[in-house]
Amino acid sequence: MTEHLTEGLKKQILAEIDTALASTDDGAVESLAVTLLSTRRIFVTGEGRSGFMAKAFAMRLMHLGLPVHVVGETTTPAVAEGDTVVAVSGSGTTPGTVRVAEQATQAGAQVHAVTTAPDSPLGTLAATSLLIPGATKYRRPGEAPSVQPLSSLFDQTTHILLDVVALRLAGLLSVDNDRARKAHANTE
């Protein structure tokens, strides 16, 4: 009986992700990929699970040979003009992420938001937003309904869409799995 419940939950989660992905703007995904190809350096930022999604994206960009840094790490250089910051926040109001976006903008960098809320503080600071129609912990009007807790649907959809961006970049850069694997950590 519990196996039936588990199978039903898996199907429900996959249906939620599929619905969210079907509502995203492919042009915005393509635009982000093209922007990242032409930027001087890429920085990613986010807090909590959004931060995990940003770090996973940074790892893929590194595998592709792109100059990427995670904001807050001890080896992260100063953001400057010509750089791009990808800021992930479901609500678009996460104080640390908004502060990084403000500082990056003041430094002359271009900010690209990954959020559910284009009119949020983060969304208004950003040059562009990759809108993710997934539920956040706030369950604001207009957010997709979800059986999952907090921002799980936003996080899952973000992970998949940022992997799509990475795949587009891999194609544009002619980086296949063998080449990406050579850039993978060999000290683990």
Where are these regions (language model features)?
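Generic N-terminal amphipathic, Lys/Arg-enriched alpha-helix
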Residues: M1-A22
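Glycine-rich phosphate-binding loops that contact phosphosugars or nucleotide phosphates
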Residues: R41-E47, F52-I160
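A short, charged, Gly/Pro-tolerant segment at domain boundaries
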Residues: M1-E3, V164, A170-E188
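A short, well-structured juxtamembrane/interface segment
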Residues: L21-S38
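Hydrophobic packing residues in well-ordered alpha-helices of helical domains and bundles
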Residues: T6, K10, V29-L32, A54
